[in-house]
Swiss-Prot record:
Cellular component GO terms, alphabetical: large ribosomal subunit
UniProt cross-references to PANTHER family, sorted A to Z: 50S RIBOSOMAL PROTEIN L32, LARGE RIBOSOMAL SUBUNIT PROTEIN BL32
Keyword set includes Ribosomal protein: yes
Annotated protein name in UniProt: Large ribosomal subunit protein bL32A
Pfam families: Ribosomal_L32p
Keyword Ribosomal protein set for record: yes
Taxonomy, superkingdom: Bacteria
Coiled coil (UniProt feature): none
Keywords: Ribonucleoprotein, Ribosomal protein
Region: Disordered, residue numbers: 1-21
Basic residues composition-biased segments: 1-19
GO process terms (BP): translation
C-alpha cells in the first residue's frame, strides 16, 4: 500500500478538496396532473401519494 513520503501542505490539501462538490438532487414533476409537485424520481409523491399512476399512500 502506498504511503506518502512527505506531509501534504494545507494549501495543497485544500486546493485538492476544493473540487469535491455535492451533487444537486434530481427532481421531477409529479406525473399526476392534479398535483404537479417536484419530487424525487422512483419515490411516491409525498403530497398526493401516487406512484406510477396509482395511489400507494394516503394523500397529505
Amino acid at each position: 500500500m502506498a504511503v506518502p513520503k512527505r506531509r501534504m501542505s494545507r494549501s495543497n490539501t485544500r486546493s485538492r478538496r476544493s473540487q469535491w462538490k455535492a451533487a444537486a438532487p434530481t427532481l421531477i414533476t409529479c406525473p399526476n396532473r392534479a398535483c404537479g409537485q417536484k419530487t424525487l424520481p422512483h419515490i411516491a409523491c409525498p403530497s398526493c401519494g401516487t406512484y406510477k399512476g396509482r395511489q400507494v399512500t394516503a394523500a397529505v
